[in-house]
Amino acid sequence: MNSMIISCAISVCKTVKEKFKASKLNSAIERVYSVISRSWQNSVITRAVKTENSKTKNSILSRVMMSPFTLLEKISVKIGDKLSDRIEKSVICELCRSYVQNAMALNSRFMGIMALSMSIVYNILKFASTGYINKYIIILSVVSAFFVIFNVNIMGFCNTSKLVEFIKHCLGFDKVSFDFWDDLRTTGRIRLVAGAMVGVLTGAVMYVSPIIGILVPFAVFGMLLVLQYPVTGVFAAVFLAPLISFSSMPLAGVCVWTLLSLVIHSLCDETFKWKREGAGVALLLFLAVLFVSSVFSFARMDSLVVWAMYFVFVTFYFAVINLIDTKEKAYGLLKVFAISGALVALYGIMQYVFGWNTSNAWIDEEMFAEETMRVYSTLANPNVLGEYLLLVLPVSIVLGIKSKKPLTKLVYLAVSAIVFVCLILTQSRGCWLGFMVSAALFITFYDGRWWMLAILALAFVPFVLPDTIMNRLMSIGDMGDSSTSYRVFIWMGTMGIVRNYFMGGIGMGEGAFAKVYPLFSYNSVIAPHSHNTFLQLLVEGGIPALAMFIAIIAVFFKNTHNGYRVCEKKSLDSAMLLGIASGVAGFLFQSMFDYTFYNYRVMAVFFMLIGINIALSGIVTRKRS
């Protein structure tokens, strides 16, 4: 019965589609779309974007800003071979490589030795201080000894698992194999020494702090894995950015370690050339301007701490464009990005359904008395969550509509639905408008003929969305809403700061803003920032900081366009470049109503996504040329 209904529905849809294609209305839409498309292609904007500016690349300023990378290349030419040879022959480095390979393989003997060493050290320290031993650790020792008897790579069983194959197929990772370790390093004694050393360290740390001690083997593995394969650090950063909810410092640590690992690899390879294309010069100038404003800040130390976080997350762009050098890596990273976003969105939906840790602190209770809940998931604030989802949603949609395998298509369309529902539940009006901007740009450049469908869909929106959502939408710009009037008063006060400090700014961060803003505030409104990213950059770094940020965005869209125009129309590459650019545009639109860089993790994701898109654009451009 169900199959008959589905078949009838598909048949009706096909009939309507064919009738519409043959209609005069479709012919009129085709003609209008063709005229607009030709006009855009011949416009001044398009011609300006197509123009290659080699003078900028070869300018003195560009060479100065890129001199650290030039210096690294010169050093690698002189010492690359010697350094690589020493690392290859080093016993310590061999221990590290063996640890990584056996941990990836989940070698039973290796894990048994590590757990046994940890158990013995922990109980020795426990007995020495208290006179007692932990019986559970004794049981772990017995189990560990049993594992030592066998020498099996447990991860190898994943290759033959039907469940694992099904999951890989659903997520679009069919080519990923679980035999990624070096078999030669899963035999011999040196791996056991490596396991025992980490086990001893784990046992000692566990005696002081059990929770931290348990994390030691994983932390050591992660650090050594990134040191051996720096690209894994990029994947880890993209996946973990929204999930580590308690602090931005772990993410900063991953980014710093990945950059250091990349530098070490570049020094060991005399043929390594740092990629300089894209927004690199503008990003470094942006950091330089903000550094100067921080040095002369009203709260110097606070500003320098904020600048240090900016430095880490902005320079991570260079790790992305240098390590993501193939389409497989780029799309693998984008899939990881979408999966991470789906987990964040799913948790947000569960917050709404089960009422977990929700609050009405972000709702004007007088104007929206029936609304009591806005979800924020792992990002502590509904607006921040919405800003993150604005970047995720276009990526997941493109993965859904362009996937060739039906099951993979279904999974990423489901991911898109989850992310979209969570975006609605944030009740962030600015983010809703940002998504509309993203959708409008994507439809216009992907296939303008979709506008008819989009307009029809918009006509049904009032009948589908709940009254609470419609009330929020209709309240946009209403000064009776406290959140709207609050922002307007903050902007008025911020403009007072700009008028007095437009050249150099007041310095970065809340500390400097808190010292200066009260002198210009309206209606005694207290605020930690200006609720507008462009205004905030103008306040913190003056006109030079805002100019550099606009330059970054301009270069980003220029690189995106250069990649887009060499791609086949409606291909996966062109759709993804367009999707990411649309997401960034929606994010920038929301930036007019909130300080979107206030949350470091969202700021990090923004610059990572810029790096991914520029890397993908470079890949398709080089392949074409």
Residue ranges and their predicted role:
Residues F298-I321:
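Alpha-helical transmembrane segments and their immediate interhelical/interface regions
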Residues L125-T130, F239-S247, L538-G541, L572-A615:
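Membrane helix-loop boundary segments at the extracytoplasmic
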Residues M301-V305, L379-N383, T426-G430, A527-L535, ...:
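Membrane-interface catalytic loops of GT-C/OST-like multi-pass glycosylation enzymes that act
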Residues C158-C170, M367-V375, C431, L458-G493, ...:
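Flexible juxtamembrane loops connecting transmembrane helices in multi-pass membrane enzymes
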Residues G542-I553:
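Hydrophobic alpha-helical transmembrane segments
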Residues I469, G477-M492, G496, N500, ...:
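Long extracytoplasmic/lumenal interhelical loops at the membrane interface
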Residues R109-M155, G188-V208, V216-M223, T258-L259, ...:
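Alpha-helical transmembrane segments of multi-pass inner-membrane proteins
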Residues M1-V292, F298-V305, D325-Y331, K335, ...:
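Transmembrane signal-anchor hairpin modules in multi-pass inner-membrane enzymes, especially those
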